[in-house]
Amino acid sequence: MKIYNTMTRKKEEFVPVKPNEVQMYVCGPTVYNFFHIGNARTFIVFDTVRKYFEYRGYKVNFIQNFTDIDDKMIAKANNEGVSVKELGDRYIKEYYEDADGLNLERATCNPRATEYIGKIIDFVKGLQDEGYAYEIDGDVYFNTNAFKEYGKLSGQNLEDRMAGATIAVDDRKKSPADFALWKSEKPGEPSWESPWGKGRPGWHIECSCMARDLLGDTIDIHAGAIDLIFPHHENEIAQSEARTGKPFSKYWMHAAYLNINNEKMSKSLNNFLTARDILKEYDAEVIRLFLLSAHYRTPLNFTEESIEAAKTSLERLYNTINNLGSLLNNTAESNDDSEYLKALDSYREKFIEKMDDDFNTADGISVIFDLAKDINININGKSSKAAVEKAISLMRELGKPLGILQKVEKHNLEDEIQNLIEQRQNARKNKDWALADKIRDDLKERGIVLEDTPEGIRWKFIDK
């Protein structure tokens, strides 16, 4: 299995710290609002990575944090007249509702930053004792000049960043690139006692502390959205490696942006879609199929047409499964399909080959469609029950790491199609050619064609 490592900018063979285990940390949401469809892409991508590791037999320790103390949270809580804790509790609850709606597997642990204040203080104190941090008027900063490898993840030269707009300007700091580990108390903000006076932690130190506490000094995979490479992940590396003297993470993974109608998503452009918005319109499996239809390192464009195309594609796959289900009671028990059963197994091998190559979900999905096409051509009423059952099982097996094809259809597809055929026959008798043509075209759009036979009208699936 190969993973593209942002740190080395190349694909590397995956070798975990502990055999057959994966220690994985994904940066989670700041809980002051509903998460948007761009966040959903990141969460679904790394949920799929986790599911695929499990499919391949690994035990995955999957940590995703909640940032529940932050400038944005404080501002919103003050604006609403509630405590930061009340705001965090509310949106953590909303997060779980939307995450469950997207079929995200629950994390092994979802630590909250405010649960780690004591350990964060100890972490910062350790950095200060080793000469990597300094205190000014109750604020504690990380000394980037003391960490000689600063910039190795993002490729940013420290000197080039001195006057950068992404760095907070503070004349008290030794270097403009130095960042806050601990912030002194300000009016209207939550604060905790510390050796430097009352205050609260900086953003970057929270993840370093929680990851180390729950996963150890060196973890296998640290992941997040591409916009976290700098400064967040760069600063995490500096803090963690300065504190432990060990590599923080063996592999760094980052998911690319999601645009809306070829524009960056933003509230000012009125194109800001929350996961909850999209879940009102589309099933979770449709959303997952769309968001996984491109490789996770490739930017993806969301349009109404593209999500509708994903919906149609998913229906085609379910049509194949449902057609197989309708054949189960009409199979030839004595037929020898042993060669075809072996041929079906080749699709599992192809799927693994694609997914082992840096979790290439786009190519993995293509394998599933190739499998469906093969099934539609080769499995029919003359096939053995073993072949039909194997085909159903394999479709669902390959869909599982992607979080698709896991639903059991509640309706009987055969009865539904037969009902539509009868409606079409009645329309033709009544010379309602428009309705008859519409029913025929609707069925064709679903991959179903009608055939006139001496025994009456029959239907079958085709690959569109």
Swiss-Prot record:
The gene is cysS. The keyword Metal-binding applies. Zn(2+) binds at residues 27, 207, 232, 236. The keyword Ligase applies. Its cofactor is Zn(2+). A motif ('HIGH' region) lies at residues 29-39. This is Cysteine--tRNA ligase. It catalyses: tRNA(Cys) + L-cysteine + ATP = L-cysteinyl-tRNA(Cys) + AMP + diphosphate. Binds 1 zinc ion per subunit. The lineage of its organism: Bacteria, Bacillati, Bacillota, Clostridia, Eubacteriales. GO terms for biological process: cysteinyl-tRNA aminoacylation. One of its GO terms (cellular component) is cytosol.
